[in-house]
Each structure stands twice: as C-alpha cells, then as structure tokens.
UniProtKB/Swiss-Prot annotation:
GS catalytic domain sequence ranges: 106-356
Segments forming domain GS beta-grasp: 19-99
Other notes: Irreversibly inhibited by the herbicide L-phosphinothricin (PPT).
One Pfam short name: Gln-synt_C
PANTHER family, A to Z: GLUTAMINE SYNTHETASE
Keyword field contains Cytoplasm: yes
GO biological process: glutamine biosynthetic process
Species the sequence originates in: Nicotiana plumbaginifolia (Leadwort-leaved tobacco)
Protein name: Glutamine synthetase
Cellular component per GO, a single term: cytoplasm
Amino acid sequence: MSLLSDLINLNLSDSTEKIIAEYIWIGGSGMDLRSKARTLSGPVTDPAKLPKWNYDGSSTGQAPGEDSEVILYPQAIFKDPFRRGNNILVMCDAYTPAGEPIPTNKRHAAAKIFSNPDVVAEEPWYGIEQEYTLLQRDINWPLGWPIGGFPGPQGPYYCGTGADKAFGRDIVDSHYKAYLYAGINISGINGEVMPGQWEFQVGPSVGISAGDEVWVARYILERIAEIAGVVVSFDPKPIPGDWNGAGAHTNYSTKSMREDGGYEVILKAIEKLGLKHKEHIAAYGEGNERRLTGKHETANISTFKWGVANRGASVRVGRDTEKAGKGYFEDRRPASNMDPYVVTAMIADTTIIGKS
C-alpha cells in the first residue's frame, strides 16, 4: 500500500514537463459529473489554449449510439489538488459536432446573459451556500445515523462538535483545503441542522465564474468522498419527516446595490423576483416541493415573501444591509441540486435585464 500511495503522490515535475489535465463535464442527468484525463506537453493557464476533446455521449445519456460523439469545450482551469504539481482540472461544457450546445449545457445560455452589456456594467456578485448530505455507502442512510434508526432530534448538530454530533468532518476539512488549493473562492464551511449534513460557501464570485466554481467544488467533494467510501447526496429532502432539507441559498448583489442608495435597488429587484416566482421555482431544482414546505427554515413553495433576517422567507435581507442602506440579499429558494449556471443567470436576467 505504501508503494501505491507513493505512486499516487508522485511529483511529475521532477522528471517531465508534461502535465495531466482532467476534463470535467456534466452528464445526462444534469447533475452527475463525469471526467477523463489527457496528457499535455506542458503547463497551461488559459482555457482558450487547451484542445477541445470528445466523449461517448451514448454512454452518458446525451447522444444516440449511431451518432455518439459529443465535443468538450474547455472553459475554466483550476489546480488539481489530487495530482498537484502543474496538473489541472478543466471545467468544460458540451456541444454537438456542429457546435450546438447539448440540452444539459446550461453554461452556454448563462454566458450569453452574463455578457449582456447591462449585466457586465452591474458586476453581479454571488455567494452560494451549497448544502449536501453524506450517506453511508450501500444503505443510502446518513453518515453517523444508526442503521435502520434515527439519531436524537435536531438541535445539537448545527455547527456542533463531538463524535455524537459531527459526522464526516475529515471529509469536510479535506475538501475545504482542496478548494483553496484549486483556486476556488471558498469562503467557509459549517455543519448543518440535520446530522450528517454539511455546507460550504463559494463566493463572492462574479458572473459565470460562480457556476464554474460550484461545479468544480462539487466534483472535488465527490472525489474526496469516493476516497473515503462515502456517498454525497444533493437531494433537497433526503430524509422525510422532521428533518431539515438541503438548499443552495444564493446571495446576490449588483454594483448599484453595493453603492449608496442600494437598498432601494434591492427592494426593486426583490419585487421583480416576486413577479416571476413560479418561473424561478421551476428552474431552482428537482424535488424542491419536498423541501419548501413553510417549515424547517423555508417559505412555502406556492408563496413568495421577503423579510429582514427572516429565514422563513423566500428572500432574506440581512440586518447589516438594512442598516447600511446597501449590500446584498439572499434568495433562499434554490434546492441543493440546482444548476448554478441556471440560477445565477436567471437572477441576473430577472433583476437587471428584466425581460424573462
């Protein structure tokens, strides 16, 4: 085993200029992540200088067998925390050979919104709170829970410490450091209300980079959990009953909101979001109706309401923002399995462009 570990951690820069690039893309479910690696002649820092690649879309549910080739376009580069050295992770989006985005490629449409001159001028910032649940492999039951049984009621687990309250901290600390190494703008982590559930926060990130960073963060988390023999669930309500669900609260601000007088801009943006509540809910993740019940720190899925410091609202404004008269707000509706490209672009579209 020591030899295997030595080989896994081999520093290639001592013997070759070649590097390994791990190309990452979103699979056919719209939530599964796929990746494969290739050798490059030397270090690369600009995704535009990376070669396009292809994969068998018939094996990912993204193309028919008789015309199975799907093309990967490199879009963002991160340092590889697993191979280290000059090796890289590459976030890609996927296209047909004719250059058309495939249905699961939500990045393409998001990039158009974020390149709109009105959106560019407003420099939208995002902070995404990604919740997830760690499951025991093979039994689909939260980490730390007794097999076939339940732990004590919620209360002591949120930001808790101790072997009877925090389950999977080794995984959490590992991915936290791996994100920092990779260049992901992670701002923190914490244990969540339901035992076995955790959260990491990405941001503030500008525009399309928020989606790139969340997807690569999910990929790194999945890889670390794979090593640990644990399953990551992004289900918005993994356990029925009196247990908190899992969301992806999305904090948002524009340049106008961050400047003096920004509070009025925030109120107008919230009003726009309320007018398009149904459209946003439809795009905010599968199974969200099981989570947005009006209980467990959520608003009911059928109702839009906002409030200051209200975690039972659809949109929450912080006390600091109210006091300062400028800042940001939090859209609490997105589910943990949301596509960050869709959510971030839709919020910008509704609040800045205002045509969708």
